[in-house]
């Protein structure tokens, strides 16, 4: 059995509900939601938490529109690929959009949205590696850089609540147990989304550069390929997903995720 291990919870990318521009006359609302298993459930759970719908008992992080037990507002749901949600906003009344897709579309999840997840969300983004690599010097160095105050300050300043740092007691960016001289000249490769993951990693890159370590950031726009290149050994780590997605990926692909936090 292949294994990918989550080694670090860095930030929560808030899920938010944005108003669309549809001019249609209808007694019902149309809301676009992500069509992948974990983010659709995430959207439905947010709508339930805000009182728009009620899900069947037991429906959790795998919920779909078929699990809606009560729909008092007669909402119609359009299931859309997550990356395309900003593009369909003009055709629906509302859309539930992940921050990593909202921000590049010039949508501010804090200022422009009607509803937004809080920092207690269980969908915090993690750094994942292939099992056996979670305690290698390179990964420990990357982990320390991402857990730094410099990264936390960047997240809080840059995204103003759209992305929330969840690292407790951020440090100086360095692991006192590591021999950084031995790491000098080495390269760490990480798969990431363009926004915000690659931007956050760019700050970690500056920290690692102080010790002569190169951080190579490989940008991806889909969720699947980053895990594939980590599993194959082409890339050291993946910083582009949350635990519920990894659990679903595990079920579909025979991988197994073990959190070490």
PLM region spans:
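Ligand-binding "clamshell"
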Residues: 89-91, 104-116, 248-260
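C-terminal motif of bacterial Sec signal peptides marking the signal peptidase cleavage site
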Residues: 16-20
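A bilobed periplasmic-binding-protein/Venus flytrap-type ligand-binding module shared by bacterial periplasmic
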Residues: 123-141
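Short helix-initiation/N-cap motifs at beta->coil->alpha
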Residues: 59-87, 217-228
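Alpha-to-beta junction loops
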Residues: 29, 52, 72-76, 90-97, ...
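Short, well-ordered beta-strand elements
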Residues: 27-32, 183-195, 213-219
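Periplasmic-binding protein-like
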Residues: 41-44, 48, 138, 146-167
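Beta->alpha turn/N-cap motifs
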Residues: 81-82, 90-93, 97-103, 194-195, ...
């Amino acid at each position: 059995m292949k294994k990918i291990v989550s080694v670090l919870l860095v930030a929560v990318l808030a899920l938010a509900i944005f108003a669309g521009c549809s001019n249609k006359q209808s007694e019902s609302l149309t809301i676009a939601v992500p069509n992948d298993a974990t983010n659709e459930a995430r959207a439905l759970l947010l709508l339930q938490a805000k009182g728009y719908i009620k899900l069947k008992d037991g429906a959790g992080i795998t919920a779909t529109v078929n699990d809606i037990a009560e729909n008092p507002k007669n909402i119609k749901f359009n299931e859309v690929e997550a990356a395309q949600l900003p593009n369909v906003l003009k055709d629906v009344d509302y859309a539930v959009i992940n921050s990593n897709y909202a921000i590049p579309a010039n949508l501010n999840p804090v200022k422009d949205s009607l509803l937004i997840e809080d920092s207690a969300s269980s969908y915090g983004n993690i750094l994942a590696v292939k099992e056996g690599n979670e305690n290698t010097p390179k990964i420990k160095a990357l982990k320390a850089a991402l857990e730094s105050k410099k990264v936390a300050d960047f997240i809080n300043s840059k995204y103003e609540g759209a992305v929330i740092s969840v690292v407790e007691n951020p440090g100086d960016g360095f692991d006192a147990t590591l021999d950084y001289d031995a790491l000098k000249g080495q390269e760490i490769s990480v798969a990431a989304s363009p926004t915000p993951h690659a931007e956050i990693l760019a700050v970690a890159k500056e920290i690692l550069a102080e010790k002569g370590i190169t951080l190579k950031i490989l940008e991806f726009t889909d969720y699947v390929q980053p895990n594939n290149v980590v599993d194959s050994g082409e890339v050291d780590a993946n910083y582009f997903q949350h635990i519920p997605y990894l659990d679903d990926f595990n079920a579909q692909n025979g991988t197994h995720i073990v959190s070490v936090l």
